[in-house]
Curated annotation (Swiss-Prot):
Species name: Legionella pneumophila (strain Corby)
Gene3D superfamilies named in the record: 3.30.1370.30, 3.30.1490.10
Entries under PROSITE patterns matching the protein: RIBOSOMAL_S8
Protein name: Small ribosomal subunit protein uS8
InterPro entries: Ribosomal_uS8, Ribosomal_uS8_CS, Ribosomal_uS8_sf
Length: 129
């Protein structure tokens, strides 16, 4: 696997299309922070991490539905290993459909709205709506 974040986003997308209640994947600090932002913004119900018997940490995301439809209409990787995308806080614009962009900034992982308020730019990890 060359891009673990793209894998995470694909698992969320596929899990919701298949109407799964939760998806589980190998954990990392970045994935946990992305999950935290998704929970704060109301795109997932909850998430938790656990250590497996083999010593690896896993993260389980509880997916969220509204009237039987997935809350996440689209989730798209923006910055990827072959093409990094960085934006200044001045260049951060709204996402169609009340969506958010998730950024990695010098002050941590946050939405584009928080980054604008704090006056920081960073790498645009993904867009969610």
């Amino acid at each position: 696997m060359h891009d673990p974040i793209a894998d995470m986003l694909t698992r969320i997308r596929n899990g919701q299309q298949a109407k799964h209640q939760q998806v589980t994947l190998v954990s990392s600090k970045l994935k946990e922070e992305i999950a935290r932002v998704l929970k704060e913004e109301g795109y997932i119900q909850d998430f938790f991490t656990e250590t497996l018997p083999n010593g690896l940490k896993s993260i389980t995301l509880k997916l969220k539905y509204y009237h039987g439809r997935p809350v996440i209409e689209f989730i798209k990787r923006i910055s990827r290993p072959g093409l990094r995308v960085y934006k200044s806080y001045k260049d951060l614009h709204s996402i169609p459909g009340f969506g958010v962009a998730i950024l990695s900034t010098s002050k941590g992982i946050m939405t584009h709205v928080s980054a604008k308020v704090k006056g920081v730019g960073g790498e645009v990890i993904c867009e969610v709506a």
